[in-house]
């Protein structure tokens, strides 16, 4: 069964929803200028409200290595998701400094993009359509099996995520806008998304 990450949490209500619905991961966006941006102090407060059983993933775009490492070491986040131009040396250094799992986002337009994603020295490639377009990429590029576990993102909803899990068996599906109403996390949509993905295991 694919795991579930709900990204872009930014309020105590969001955390309350997560604590009740128990996704496998949640995400805090530290990239300035993004709609769902949270400051370090805000994230620390939200992490303190979040169930210890749910790992928090920090989303970064070209942040100084030391800052990302500090957030991991302090326990504000348990995993790092890199969305900028971070090279292999950056990722390897972060891994060596913290031992934490690392995700690296890749925009998928071709088989070559997939090859680059799966050869990059991260724990999990995150396959996406780009900068929060809310649309899926061409899933026909994917196969049933992959060289390493990956997170599938971009345009996922309660309607299409179960199909993606059934067809491609990603390690995890990553959703943000697909569980929102008017730019805010929607409890009903979060619950429906999680139930739809997890029901696959009981139906098969």
Residue positions per predicted region:
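Conserved N-terminal beta1-alpha1 strand-loop-helix module at the mouth
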Residues: 1-127, 131-204
């Amino acid at each position: 069964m694919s795991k579930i990450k709900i990204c872009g949490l930014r309020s105590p209500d969001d955390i309350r929803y997560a604590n009740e619905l128990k996704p496998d991961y949640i995400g805090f966006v530290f990239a300035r200028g993004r709609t769902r941006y949270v400051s370090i102090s805000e994230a620390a407060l939200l992490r303190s409200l979040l169930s210890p059983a749910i790992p928090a993933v920090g989303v970064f775009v070209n942040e100084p290595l030391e800052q990302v490492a500090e957030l991991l070491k302090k326990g504000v986040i348990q995993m790092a998701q890199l969305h900028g131009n971070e090279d292999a040396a950056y990722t390897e250094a972060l891994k060596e400094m913290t031992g934490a799992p690392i995700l690296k986002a890749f925009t998928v337009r071709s088989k070559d993009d997939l090859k680059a994603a799966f050869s990059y020295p991260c724990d999990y490639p995150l396959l996406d359509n780009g900068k929060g377009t809310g649309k899926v990429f061409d899933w026909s590029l994917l196969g049933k099996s992959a060289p390493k576990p990956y997170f599938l993102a971009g345009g996922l909803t309660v309607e299409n995520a179960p199909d993606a899990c059934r067809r491609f068996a990603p390690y995890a599906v990553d959703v943000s806008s697909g569980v929102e109403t008017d730019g805010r996390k929607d409890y009903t949509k979060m619950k429906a998304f999680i139930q739809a993905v997890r029901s696959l295991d009981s139906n098969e």
